[in-house]
Design a protein with these regions (language model features):
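Conserved, well-structured interaction surfaces
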Residues: 46, 50, 54-60, 83-161, ...
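Short, well-structured active-site flanking segments
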Residues: 28, 158-169, 240
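Bacterial Sec-dependent N-terminal signal peptides
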Residues: 1-31
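Membrane-proximal, proline-rich intrinsically disordered regions
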Residues: 21-72, 98, 241, 248-252, ...
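Short, surface-exposed recognition loops and adjoining beta-strand edges that mediate ligand/DNA contacts
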Residues: 36, 63-83, 167, 202-219, ...
Length: 261
């Protein structure tokens, strides 16, 4: 009798494990969710935005930790070391570089386009999202931050390279080959992204709790002014008074800060 009971229990266990096997095997790894199960709730978009911002800190930190090493390419400092963690600025300063040179040359290009790709995924899925757990203001805020990030990444590409591809949507098999765009087009895209973000964000300083950890309108105006300043001189080094006036007006419009007398 005991043997029969054991056989019945074993059979029941086998049937149970067989019927539940498919469910068990279909479990998606929580650490790396696929596109098919992502973008389902507000926290997914918050994670995606954080992931987009994380490209700014991607090793070796060409847009963050080692950004000060750009001074090695000026008269402000001298580079004694030539590792990637110094941007390979010694090699760049000597002119001994090619498209495969590591440091700033390759990492800036790679990280900016990786960041732009992440931003496009976020923007496209956010615009299509119909979930009730996200208000219209929250969606507008995230889209504005995504535009600000795209403009920020392109601002580095604009400053470090001459002509680069202008990608404004996720790449597919149909549009993966992108020709280089003119510097004027890249500059216009940066200004458009910054202006769109500035208009959509609440006009609060970074010290405000809502803006902590994000682009504020003031920060974007400062970044915009920096690029405008580089374009305010003619080929002979003479400043354009009209362009300079626009820059001053832009800086004076920053909330919570003011120009020194």
């Amino acid at each position: 009798m005991k043997k029969i009971v054991n056989i019945i229990l074993a059979s029941a266990l086998l049937v149970s494990s067989t019927t539940s096997c498919s469910d068990f095997l279909q479990k998606d790894p929580p650490s790396s969710p696929s596109q098919s199960i992502f973008w389902q709730k507000k926290s997914d978009f918050q994670s995606a935005l954080a992931g987009s911002f994380s490209m700014v800190y991607e090793w070796p930190g060409v847009m963050s930790q080692i950004v000060a090493c750009f001074d090695n390419l000026t008269d402000n400092s001298i580079c004694q070391h030539d590792e990637d963690t110094y941007g390979k600025t010694k090699t760049i300063a000597l002119g001994d570089l090619d498209p495969n040179t590591s440091g700033y040359v390759t990492y800036m290009y790679k990280h900016c386009y990786q960041g732009i790709a992440r931003v496009h995924l976020l923007m496209e899925n956010l615009e299509a999202y119909q979930g009730t757990d996200m208000s219209a203001d929250e969606k507008s805020f995230m889209l504005a931050q995504a535009k600000a990030l795209r403009g920020y990444f392109y601002s580095w590409l604009y400053q470090c390279y001459r002509e680069v591809p202008l990608v404004t949507e996720s790449l597919t098999m149909d549009n993966m080959y992108q020709a280089k765009a003119s510097r004027a087009d890249i500059y216009a895209q940066i200004m458009n992204d910054f202006d769109g973000a500035i208009a959509a964000l609440p006009d609060k300083p970074y010290s405000d709790a809502q803006m902590s950890g994000y682009f504020s309108p003031g920060a974007l105006k400062a970044l915009k002014a920096r690029l405008m300043l580089a374009e305010a001189y003619d080929d002979k080094g003479n400043a354009d008074p009209s362009k300079m006036g626009d820059i001053v007006s832009l800086l004076e419009s920053i909330n919570g800060y003011s120009l020194a007398d």
